[in-house]
Design a protein with these regions (language model features):
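N-terminal flexible segment immediately upstream of the FAD-binding catalytic core
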Residues: 1-72, 85-116
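Residue-level detector of anion-binding/catalytic polar loops
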Residues: 76-77, 139
Length: 144
C-alpha cells in the first residue's frame, strides 16, 4: 500500500498531464475497483474491501507510459482494467493505488496480411476488431 504522501504527489503530477483523465470521486473509486468477482462466494468476502485510491483513464499510448512511469517513481501500485467483465478479481486493486482504465484506447493498429497477426490497443472492443478483420477477408475465430 502506498503512503498518503506518495499518492498525493502522484495525483498532483498526473493532474498536469493533458492526456490523462483523473477520477477521484467515491462512486468512481468503488465502481472501478470491482469486477464480477461477487458471483463467487469465496472471492466476494476476500475482495469486497479492496479499493483504488485513484482511477486514471489515459487518452493516448503516451499517457499510459506517463502513468506507468509516474506510478513506478512514486511507488504506487498500478492495476490494469479492461471492461471489468472478468469474474476472478483480475482488475481489483488488491493493495490500493491506481486503477488504469483502458477504454479510451480502442484502435486496431495493424493487421499483417501475410500472417494474420493483429495489433490492437488495450481497450479495443471485440466487435470493432471483428469488423476490421471482416473488411480484410478474415474473421476472429477464437475470443482471447
Amino acid at each position: 500500500m502506498a503512503s498518503t504522501e506518495s499518492l498525493e504527489a502522484l495525483a498532483a503530477e498526473l493532474a498536469t498531464a493533458n492526456d490523462l483523465e483523473l477520477l477521484q470521486g467515491a462512486a468512481d473509486l468503488q465502481r472501478y475497483s470491482k469486477d464480477a468477482y461477487d458471483y463467487s462466494p469465496i472471492l466476494q468476502p476476500q475482495l469486497a474491501s479492496c479499493r483504488a485510491d485513484l482511477v486514471v483513464r489515459p487518452l493516448s499510448v503516451a499517457g499510459v507510459e506517463r502513468l506507468a512511469a509516474a506510478c513506478g517513481r512514486h511507488g504506487v501500485p498500478l492495476t490494469l482494467r479492461g471492461s471489468g467483465t472478468g469474474n476472478y478479481g483480475q482488475s481489483v486493486p488488491l493493495e490500493g493505488g491506481v486503477v488504469m482504465l483502458s477504454g479510451a484506447l480502442r484502435e486496431v493498429e495493424h493487421l499483417d496480411p501475410s500472417t494474420g497477426v493483429v495489433t490492437v490497443q488495450p481497450g479495443c472492443l471485440m466487435r470493432d476488431l471483428d469488423q476490421h478483420l471482416r473488411a480484410h477477408g478474415r474473421q476472429l475465430r477464437l475470443l482471447p
